[in-house]
From Swiss-Prot:
Localization per Swiss-Prot or TrEMBL: Host nucleus
Compositional bias annotation for Polar residues: 24-38
Keyword Electron transport among record annotations: no
Official protein name in the record: Protein E8^E2C
């Protein structure tokens, strides 16, 4: 409290006027102090100033990462736009046993069937000689078996020879017979669907010509 005394000079009786004015002191807080001390004031001051955690360096890194992901192409979960050709259609190609060696290459007397063969398969089949089967057994069993196969409607082979034997061979199963086929696939099918005579053995082979 501040006391202001005004003195008026007069001839008769001096008079005193008292004027009271409230001034800020240590006991009376000001408006600015109340605003800073109150929690509401803190919330307002914080809300008025927006904060940002991203810096220019981090934003630059994000832009670079986005460009790298675009250049890298589709991820593992995405389907690529182009697919490899081949293998999508039904039906498998006829597989050959193996590529012909230089000793197996010869001249064939018949054209190779192109159905079910790729370009590589055709070249390998054309390079091979006519596939054959050599039967070994007794003369009677081979003759009877040949007679039945020649009279059947579905023979499944190209040519079949007569029963013959090597000169000087006196073994029990000394008789031989040759069966020629168009392709290795036909030969495999013949072996799969036909029974050979009892105690008869066979082996694969090929000839330059028939």
């Amino acid at each position: 409290m501040k006391l202001k005394i005004l003195l008026h000079s007069s001839t008769n009786t001096p008079s005193f006027d008292f004027e009271e004015q409230q001034l800020p002191g240590p006991s009376t807080p000001t408006y600015t102090e109340l605003t800073q001390a109150s929690p509401c004031g803190r919330g307002k001051s914080r809300e008025s100033q927006p904060t940002s955690t991203t810096s220019p360096e981090t934003s630059g890194l994000r832009v670079r990462r986005g460009r790298r992901q675009r250049k890298s192409g589709p991820g593992p979960g995405e389907t690529p736009s182009k697919r490899r050709r081949g293998g999508g259609r039904g039906g498998g190609e006829t597989r050959l046993e193996s590529a012909p060696s230089p000793g197996e290459v010869g001249i064939r007397h018949r054209t190779v069937e192109r159905q079910g063969l790729s370009r590589l398969g055709q070249l390998q089949a054309e390079a091979r000689d006519p596939p054959m089967i050599l039967l070994k057994g007794t003369a009677n069993s081979l003759k009877c078996w040949r007679y039945r196969k020649q009279n059947s409607s579905n023979c499944g082979f190209l040519f079949m020879s007569t029963v013959w034997n090597w000169v000087g061979d006196v073994s029990e199963n000394h008789s031989r017979m040759l069966i020629a086929f168009k392709s290795p696939g036909q030969r495999d099918s013949f072996v799969k669907h036909n029974l050979f005579p009892k105690l008869c053995t066979y082996t694969y082979g090929s000839l330059n010509s028939l």
